[in-house]
Amino acid sequence: MTDFTLTKDADGIATITWDVVGKSMNVLSLEGWDDLDGCVTDALGDDAVKGIVITSGKDTFAGGMDLNVIAKMKAMSGDDPAAGLMDGLMKSHAILRKIERANLDPKTNKGGKPVACVLPGTALGIGFEIPLACHRIF
């Protein structure tokens, strides 16, 4: 099961819903980053999609990053944990930047797709960074 799901409606709105199964509040894992990246890439690449909404399937938006993520990044990096952590942070930054730019033309800053975040409640840590990367927060 994925932490983020993508649905598209007939009006051209793609909705990315964050709903971590088995948790009372959404927390971001490494797998969750991959899910979010895949959903955003899919929505941005679909010409039928005119806009993107990111929201939560829970009463709150997010409690932040799963604290085990840092330990996983260190473990995956082998002999150079600092490089592993930096790689993880840069991957996170790239995904947030993808949301922020949303296919804008890099020379003219025109085009692209609007991305809105609908917060049903609390947004902490990375759960606040994601909405900040969006164009509007509701």
Map each language-model feature to its residues:
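Glycine- (often His-adjacent) and acidic-residue-rich active-site loop
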Residues: 56-95, 123
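Short, histidine-centered active-site or binding-site loop motifs used for metal coordination
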Residues: 17-22, 74, 114, 119
